[in-house]
């Protein structure tokens, strides 16, 4: 598997991860209970069937995975059944149950339906760079990333992770790049961007499959629009879209990176897993260090 998005968090490089493998067996995902809506806990990066190797580490990169089980119980189904019961009571007793009774009836319905509800499984993966003090979560959702930080915090007892903080406004950097300012070495423009009028409720322009250095784009910039999302290519190895929230979306590993796998000495599924982990973690580190310098990202130490 390859990461498709990157939500970064920083943490002090002095954070101690030495007890992770000892702590993980006590924080594993448990099957969601009959009367529970969801369950969450760590699973092995190698898959749920793996019970021994609960983390994976190569040099200063650590791979952790959180699994989830969620009951699928649409609110519309519950509300429809509740309405039927309310109508039955109204027809038999000539009254419409009030708020407190309605809540009790809804709770009873949930207890009745939950054991029969379908369960949806999920997983979230993260690479932790112990040397440079960042976590890269494979998600485009800040909220999902925060949940992962909470899971690590619960595992370690404390974990002072924080979202990326740029000392220079990301919009100004992205807007400058599309306006013709020099890009960092190795970066080039892709063919996608989003621009917004800075006033609240202002116009939004989205461009795809388009040359970004052109008169049309310049007109929008001259009108005061700022770049909020920008497609970039990092050497021949990565393509992605970065937003002014510093979340990396639509991440793709290109031939320049994937060619390294063809020359890897792979022998079996586990060896292939190791090769992909080593490749991804190394490329993501290179990208992070580039973004750190370009956006003047604050340290967590």
From Swiss-Prot:
Belongs to the RdgC family. It is found in: Cytoplasm, Nucleoid. It comes from the Bacteria. May be involved in recombination. Signal peptide: none annotated. One of its GO terms (cellular component) is cytoplasm. GO terms for molecular function: double-stranded DNA binding. The keyword Cytoplasm applies. GO terms for biological process: DNA recombination; regulation of DNA recombination. This is Recombination-associated protein RdgC. Keywords: Cytoplasm, DNA recombination. It comes from Stenotrophomonas maltophilia (strain R551-3). PANTHER family: RECOMBINATION-ASSOCIATED PROTEIN RDGC. The keyword Cytoplasm applies.
């Amino acid at each position: 598997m390859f990461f498709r998005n990157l939500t970064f968090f920083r943490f002090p490089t002095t954070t101690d991860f030495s007890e992770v493998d000892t702590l993980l067996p006590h924080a594993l995902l448990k099957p969601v209970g009959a009367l529970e809506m969801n369950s969450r806990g760590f699973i092995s990066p190698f898959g749920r069937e793996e019970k021994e190797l609960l983390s994976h580490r190569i040099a200063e990169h650590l791979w952790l995975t959180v699994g989830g089980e969620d009951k699928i119980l649409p609110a519309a189904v519950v509300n429809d059944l509740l309405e039927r019961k309310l109508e039955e009571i109204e027809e038999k007793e000539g009254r419409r149950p009030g708020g407190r009774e309605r809540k009790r009836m809804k709770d009873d319905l949930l207890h009745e339906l939950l054991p029969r509800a379908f369960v949806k499984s999920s997983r979230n993966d993260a690479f932790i760079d112990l040397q440079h003090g960042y976590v890269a979560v494979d998600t485009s959702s800040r909220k999902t990333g925060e949940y992962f930080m909470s899971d690590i915090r619960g595992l370690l007892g404390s974990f002072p992770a924080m979202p990326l903080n740029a000392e220079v406004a990301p919009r100004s950097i992205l807007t400058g790049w599309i306006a013709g300012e020099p890009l960092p070495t190795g970066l080039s423009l892709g063919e996608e961007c989003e621009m917004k009028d800075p006033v609240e409720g202002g116009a939004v322009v989205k461009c795809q499959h388009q040359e970004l250095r052109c008169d049309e784009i310049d007109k929008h910039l001259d009108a005061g629009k700022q770049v909020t999302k920008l497609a970039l290519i990092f050497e021949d190895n990565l393509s992605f879209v970065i937003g002014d929230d510093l979340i990396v979306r639509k991440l793709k590993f290109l031939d320049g990176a994937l060619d390294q796998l063809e020359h890897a000495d792979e022998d079996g599924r586990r060896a292939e897993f190791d090769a992909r982990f080593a490749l991804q973690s190394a490329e993501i580190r290179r990208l992070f260090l580039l973004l750190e310098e370009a956006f003047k990202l604050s340290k967590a130490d």
